[in-house]
């Protein structure tokens, strides 16, 4: 639909200008930016009042978009990722040196996910790569469940790409690729 394509094109243009973008994901509204824009990363962390040591998630429309951050993984690790995506599965992968410090936080790993939300997939395809994804809320507050919640929390500090949530009841599972440990169900 042309209206959706136009809204996505506007969102991509905003991201390229360094904007913070709020968008619906599978379960909650996400807040993101260009993962290679240090100023946008710093603004996102400050706006959320998030501890920068925690790091952030990269969300992609397909696994190929994450390739620069996955370089160095072996075939078994890649197969494990591929069989769980797309979907609500976030993996902690060893940082190969590609991730910006604010993206990684104090960790030696990076959180990555391939979304199965159609709007997120279209957005990442139009952007040409993954985006930062963090729940759209201030630290310690519940995540936004609607565009109205986003506006109430952040006002005009973010660009909004309106759409429907994906129907999942909870945020993604988080697992460590090296240990296999599940950190959040």
Curated annotation (Swiss-Prot):
Domain YrdC-like: 5-185
Keyword annotations: ATP-binding, Cytoplasm, Nucleotide-binding, Nucleotidyltransferase, Transferase, tRNA processing
Domain of life where this protein originates: Bacteria
Catalytic reaction(s) noted: L-threonine + hydrogencarbonate + ATP = L-threonylcarbamoyladenylate + diphosphate + H2O
GO biological process: regulation of translational fidelity; tRNA threonylcarbamoyladenosine modification
Gene from which the chain derives: tsaC
Protein name: Threonylcarbamoyl-AMP synthase
Organism field: Chromohalobacter salexigens (strain ATCC BAA-138 / DSM 3043 / CIP 106854 / NCIMB 13768 / 1H11)
Protein role: Required for the formation of a threonylcarbamoyl group on adenosine at position 37 (t(6)A37) in tRNAs that read codons beginning with adenine. Catalyzes the conversion of L-threonine, HCO(3)(-)/CO(2) and ATP to give threonylcarbamoyl-AMP (TC-AMP) as the acyladenylate intermediate, with the release of diphosphate.
Class of this enzyme: transferase
Matching SUPFAM superfamilies: YrdC/RibB
Enzyme Commission number: 2.7.7.87
GO MF term set: ATP binding; double-stranded RNA binding; L-threonylcarbamoyladenylate synthase; tRNA binding
